[in-house]
């Protein structure tokens, strides 16, 4: 039994889109993902950190979720900035039921438990007051509420946070998110979103008592990162 994490699968079976614009290592990435994800077993849990599919709606995402359905075990899903198919949790679960897709769970205003650890998280957002718009500020504040709701729901359990957007990288710190992680004594924080040359902006390792790690698929060479045994 193990807990894995990987973000940014960028599946495009129902909405073909070239991915090599993000770098040459995306060539043949579907085959790389299939091989990399083969380490996951039926007793494992995998957190998918957003940007799962390029589809614009759930119907168009059916082939991509059929592919995800082949990943064994429990799949916990959070939203990325390119998940335009994203709908309400009830519509997503109905879609999964109608298509025979099993063991997929939305991480949004809630938490899940793995071996005594709380899996918390939300999409996150970039916002800098001097450059942000009113829309960005509203989305950012909403994401802060969702993250704190997720953390609160876990009570006294030790917490691991999963985000799509990085809460810090070279030249940027999202102080509000970092303060929440500190306040709720989060041990580890995993994030995605950064690709190609942007990997060089990622900050990984210990910062203020929290361990950060980038788990975008191309950063991991399309192999899931093992968070816990």
Question: What spans do the regions from the language model cover?
Answer:
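Short, well-ordered coil/turn elements that cap or connect secondary structure elements
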Residues: 41, 70-72, 101, 114, ...
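N-terminal active-site segment of His-dependent metallophosphoesterases
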Residues: 1-70, 84, 142, 146-157
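Binuclear metal-dependent phosphoesterase catalytic core
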Residues: 17, 24, 31-35, 113, ...
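Metal-dependent catalytic neighborhoods of phosphoester/phosphodiester hydrolases
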Residues: 16-17, 49-69, 84-100, 130, ...
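His/acidic metal-ligating clusters that form di-metal
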Residues: 32-45, 134-201
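Conserved catalytic scaffold of divalent metal-dependent phosphoesterases
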Residues: 9-14, 83-173
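Structural recognition of alpha->loop->beta junctions
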Residues: 70, 94-108, 177-195
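Active-site neighborhood of phospho(di)ester-bond hydrolases with catalytic His/Asp-centered motifs
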Residues: 5-7, 46-51, 75-81, 105-108, ...
